[in-house]
């Protein structure tokens, strides 16, 4: 989520999702999902999804707000994806408003990054 909304009413959550293999069995995290949690009471939450691929496993998504952003989802979602087929990791950058359009940028990292637990984006530069 946009951490500027921590402790406040917010609408959007970005999550790692499992790709459904069948009605019962779920797989590992292979999808980036954006949920709009603000529909009317009793209505289903709206979602946008991006599937990374058969042997691609994502880590926790991180929201990085645009410095000039106004809306809650004015920013980017950063996701490290481990591609088991290539034994490489990629950093994918998504426009937070349009997850379903796919990444706006992808950087292949020199090394394979093992799955991490949690991450956080800070607007402050620490020297």
PLM feature segments, named:
Residues 1-127:
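Beta-propeller domains
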